[in-house]
């Protein structure tokens, strides 16, 4: 034993002074004094359990004593009757054995390889004993889990990382994966559970028994994140589920982790052999796999970035030339050649390194240098952790702990130890760089690209600093990191194949660099991640965005500008194709071309396939709306033109729907016989409201009224003949059905037919004569107001002319001014009372006083009031052109007409853009004050005077 340095002798005196009065200080051997001066953990443990000192004196720790761990622990567990007792005994046994291991290590009673073995066997012994005790307890409670043949099913535990390799460090987490062989249910218990439930509950209890801190401490911190799907996945998986996961979507890092996986406990049973055989093809490829080098280089780069980012200076595990680089060197050969060289299929590092040397895979002497460095670094790591039973690999800055490590490593002082350490780490770094290559980026561009890869691939936390985000304020930086972290968690729940992950890893750094160059980075990122979540399992779409940078830029621009567009793209990723050509993306279809475009689009789909026809109609609408929204966002379409395009689009779709419905009806019932000697179909669709007024918005419904001119006695001429008027009723019902059927792309439009004669109580389709009679004799004033904004949007020229004549006759009917004024005003007040002000501290752009509805009521009132003298007022159905007509016919002065037109288009523009933002149509109470004053003044002038 090396004598204590003066500094440690002085520290021992401090330790002795604080020992309890009844502590047998005088009886302590020089060895005991040295170890207690070295390790606070040992000091505190023997103060709490003085009897352990006697055991150490009577039975000094030995290299082979790990062989007795199982028997010693089982002896202590015999008297345990409940989980609390189990947890206490596990903790005390672990602490006592760790004191013995620390004692032997500090005094160099055992070699470093033997210390690693003791630490690993101790952990395995505790894990298996806890599992077996809890398995028996759970079987008593719920019965024994069995497969379909009644064979009992065990819980198998894969120890990962250093635990699996038999190289556990002194104070370490344990990485575990739980599995059970076959599905089935429990038998013989008070109530039956399926095996998944049983093993999940058992797994939860096992983690609690090992991990939960009590007054006796904890056994091990348990990390289950290496299991399939990580924290998002089931706690325990069946063999079949494990096999499916690793075959379909096992990632490179999971393959590397599985190299060291070892089944805890019985390694020779049939189920253990089955599990090993199942995992082997995933880990060791039959061919030489050089792609491993780049993957490991990427992983090493990620670790190096973490070291830099977190300021992990003097880290003997993760730093340059540290333990992790030795592990990487060994894994490169295991993963490249392990499938062909059984000698490389070992879990422990040192035997594998010896096999690498025997196979001459490293230059002469390098394996010897790596072995020496590994043992040096592992001893230093374990000594460092045994000081306080603390999981750390960072060298101390204080003089006391530096003196402790110098003594434990048999060097005279810290400077000597530092020089030895630097020499070992330099040797490791040289071998690593020669084999895997230095990952340091050379040029500024390469460095920047590295930062974006870091941002995506490293599990950055909100407090981490990334150079890529240095230009963002703290709140935005945290938001971006949180969004990326949430997206990564969501990905863990998805089934993504290796190709999909590869493309995603190529795409994301580019996407993040584009988004994070914007001042509003969190906004587009929050809108795009739901889209990406929806397409990660569809590699074609990921490749589209990865291979077409222009499409990616347009996606970010549109999503940043509009959550409506982002939501639409997320729901219907087929629309991503529309981003490929910027020349067409921001250019909506020409005004007269929507029908032709749709006709061409539908030619791709078999005419007889109704389902595909419906889907194609919806896809066409969504694609065209995306083009309109893109032009709207880009500012190339003013508000009037946006509504025009949305209206033309709706008319083209209505035309196609009527054609489809007509074809289906004629195929089923034949043609109404009154059509034999004439052109056309004797059918018309009247658009009311926003459709009639050329004022559709992005989410507007369609107000429709259906007319026909079929005489009462007409029948159809098909094999299943029906009454002609019944034919038109079923035609209208079919049209409504085609609009409202929900496919994977949603519905076409919401359709409202309640503006027909007698409303919801009336016939869905009426004759033109019945419509005229109703309007003349039964309709209310508000129905005549609605007629102002009505026009035929589909129909025979003759029927259209008939409707136009009816509309003109009704609108030009002389009316008594005061009565009309009262009726219009009362209707407006009823609307206000019915709708109510749902946002008392906001201005509802459409419904509140001074808003859009007031303007509409003003124009409708003026048409009804003056059209008898000025029939030209009935020419148009949209408010803007009606206001022009009012000025041209000297009813309203031009200044007022212009002011109302400005107010109307301004308010409608605001509604359009709120819709693009998926925001409700109300704004701050002081907004649009000038426009509202104008509308209120006109209301006062025309309807209150």
Swiss-Prot record:
Record region (Adenylyl transferase): 449-945
Region annotation (Adenylyl removase) ranges: 1-440
A GO cellular component entry from the record: cytosol
E.C. numbers: 2.7.7.89, 2.7.7.42
Reaction catalyzed: [glutamine synthetase]-O(4)-(5'-adenylyl)-L-tyrosine + phosphate = [glutamine synthetase]-L-tyrosine + ADP; [glutamine synthetase]-L-tyrosine + ATP = [glutamine synthetase]-O(4)-(5'-adenylyl)-L-tyrosine + diphosphate
InterPro entries (UniProt xref): GlnE (IPR023057), GlnE_rpt_dom (IPR005190), NT_sf (IPR043519), PII_UdlTrfase/GS_AdlTrfase (IPR013546)
Gene Ontology BP, a term: regulation of glutamine family amino acid metabolic process
Keyword Phosphoprotein applies: no
Molecular function terms from GO: [glutamate-ammonia-ligase] adenylyltransferase activity; [glutamine synthetase]-adenylyl-L-tyrosine phosphorylase activity; ATP binding; magnesium ion binding
Stored Pfam families: GlnD_UR_UTase, GlnE
Cofactor(s) required, per the database record: Mg(2+)
Keywords: ATP-binding, Magnesium, Multifunctional enzyme, Nucleotide-binding, Nucleotidyltransferase, Transferase
Similarity-based family: Belongs to the GlnE family.
NCBIfam families per UniProt: PRK11072.1 (NF008292)
Main function: Involved in the regulation of glutamine synthetase GlnA, a key enzyme in the process to assimilate ammonia. When cellular nitrogen levels are high, the C-terminal adenylyl transferase (AT) inactivates GlnA by covalent transfer of an adenylyl group from ATP to specific tyrosine residue of GlnA, thus reducing its activity. Conversely, when nitrogen levels are low, the N-terminal adenylyl removase (AR) activates GlnA by removing the adenylyl group by phosphorolysis, increasing its activity.
Protein name: Bifunctional glutamine synthetase adenylyltransferase/adenylyl-removing enzyme
Taxonomic source organism: Klebsiella pneumoniae subsp. pneumoniae (strain ATCC 700721 / MGH 78578)
